[in-house]
Swiss-Prot record:
Protein name: Cobyric acid synthase
HAMAP family attached to this UniProt entry: CobQ
Gene Ontology MF: a single term: ABC-type vitamin B12 transporter activity
Catalytic residues, chain numbering: 339 (nucleophile), 419
Pfam families, sorted: CbiA, GATase_3
Function: Catalyzes amidations at positions B, D, E, and G on adenosylcobyrinic A,C-diamide. NH(2) groups are provided by glutamine, and one molecule of ATP is hydrogenolyzed for each amidation.
């Protein structure tokens, strides 16, 4: 097999596309194939820095890891980073090219389509298989004219399409049927079959519904992946970051006490994955919060990154969270700001890049000033600590103590521009010891055996195992080798 490719589309956002692609990459590598992930266009503020010094979606970095590859801009040539409700920063081949309004995006389509086609063609020449991920859902037919990642990509590259859906949300059979039904006949012809994700219970109870789905659509279901609560790292979509929701699956504490973490769910949150390493720790309970009352009883408050720092800072004040964070810090308890969250902790922010508000006061918990530069900083660090930087804001003045060469601190208030910092196991353990001491949690015991990197690989191995055990892998390999088989067109009122 050389240059085989398929597209994993979804009934909705957060249906399981990213993890299915990652699991397929890991499984095919196990089978001796060279594999690359590909997402033509991603809309996400969860991003990573590549070996070329560019920027791609974090999910594609995870999928590259699954395939045994370093992250590359080739795997996600178009990245849209929403900074407001109607505009996004446009990143092409890893570099910012400007901002684009949703209504104007169609004017860029031809150029971007050529970039996508070039990168996919190159990957197909270099790898045995390319596993592509769609965006959102192909059922969003209002976006078909500008689509580069779903059926627009599949039609341009003649890719067979597998549609995956999350049955845990309910209504999946209707979603699968309807997704195919609303497509144009030429797009329908590429949809080869379905995958059911996150099924709880006895799969035999689902069998009659899948048989009827096959009769209605003329397409098989390649398998049913069971729900598994260990698969939660590297969340792709902000829809997964729900206010009040727990991060991960909390493990029992090693000592007599737990640590409670309140992570602020900013409206324009970016790189929410930074806090996942905390949730890997036994006895650490991490919850997304949006109200000042939710800070009560927290041992640690985390302000994550933001694609609109000044706007989200104003939101903190409007929600009463700014005052709550200040009170938390005044009580001597720990606060961590990452990237945009770090900038919010400072005294002043001068931002002519992402905001029209100019110079504004920060929370003042760190005596430092931030100035935004037009040129974005993109850095990937490996030694002695590993992490990466993606930011316009620069520290212009500081009267605070340096924190490990990667940030600033005042007492138990910490700030850093580094994403992925808490993935460094030894640093995280030492820092959690400080956090517990500041909170008076003498009965909290930091585990000495948590390896976040190994946990990520174990998750990818688990996803590959689930695919191998529950999907028709032979049929999927046939799609890669032979393309889309003939499938009937579904006649609906849309196509009459």
């Amino acid at each position: 097999m050389t240059g085989g490719a398929l597209l994993v589309a979804g009934t909705t956002s957060d249906a399981g596309k990213s993890m299915l692609v990652g699991g397929l990459c890991r499984l095919l590598v196990r089978k001796g194939l060279s594999v690359a992930p590909f997402k033509a266009q991603n809309m996400s503020n969860n991003s990573a820095v590549t070996v070329e010094g560019g920027e791609i979606g974090r999910a594609q970095a995870m999928q590259a890891r699954a395939a045994g590859l370093a992250p590359s801009v080739r795997f996600n040539p178009i990245l849209l980073k929403p900074g407001g409700d109607r505009t996004s920063q446009l990143v092409v081949r890893g570099q910012v090219t400007g901002s684009v309004a949703a209504a104007d995006y169609i004017n860029h389509r031809d150029h971007l389509a050529a970039v996508v086609a070039d990168e996919l063609s190159s990957l197909r020449e270099d790898f045995d298989a390319v596993i592509c991920e769609g965006a959102g859902s192909p059922a969003e037919i209002n976006l078909r004219a500008t689509d580069l990642a779903n059926m627009g990509l599949a039609r341009a590259a003649a890719l067979p399409v597998i549609v995956v859906g999350d049955i845990d949300r309910g209504g999946l059979l209707a979603h699968l049927h309807g997704t195919v039904a609303v497509l144009e006949p030429a797009d329908q012809a590429l949809v080869s079959g379905f995958v059911v994700n996150k099924f709880r219970g006895d799969p035999s109870l689902l069998a009659p519904g899948l048989r009827q789905l096959a009769e209605l659509t003329g397409r098989p279901t390649y398998g049913v992946i069971p729900f598994h609560d260990e698969i939660w790292l590297d969340t792709e979509d902000s829809v997964s970051v729900r206010p009040g929701g727990l991060v991960g699956a909390p493990e029992p504490p090693r000592g007599e006490q737990t640590l409670t973490v309140a992570a602020i769910r900013l409206p324009r949150i970016s790189n929410s994955t930074d806090i996942e390493a905390l949730a890997c720790e036994p006895g650490v309970v991490v919850r997304w919060v949006t109200d000042a009352a939710d800070l009560t009883g927290a041992d640690l408050v985390v302000i994550p990154g933001s694609k609109a720092t000044v706007t989200d800072l104003r939101w903190l004040r409007e929600r009463g969270l700014a005052a709550g964070i200040a009170a938390h810090a005044a009580a001597g308890r720990a606060v961590l700001g990452v990237c945009g969250g770090f900038q919010m902790l400072c005294s002043r922010i001068d931002d002519p890049v992402e905001s029209r508000e100019g110079r504004v006061d920060g929370l003042g918990l760190l005596d430092a000033d931030i100035e935004f530069a037009a040129q974005k900083t993109l850095r990937h660090w490996e030694t002695p600590l590993h992490g990466y930087e993606i930011h316009h804001g620069q520290v212009a003045r500081s009267a605070e103590t340096d924190w490990l060469g990667i940030g600033l601190r005042r007492g138990a208030v910490y700030g850093t521009h580094w994403h992925g910092l808490l993935d460094n196991d030894a640093l995280r353990r030492d820092w959690l010891t400080e956090v517990a001491a500041a909170a008076g949690r003498d009965g909290f015991v930091v585990a000495d055996d948590v390896d976040v990197s190994a946990r990520r690989d174990a998750q990818l191995d688990l996803m590959a195992d689930l695919i191998e055990n529950h999907l028709d892998v032979g049929a999927i390999l046939d799609l890669l080798e032979h393309g889309a088989p003939h499938r009937p067109t579904m006649s609906t009122a849309l196509h009459v």
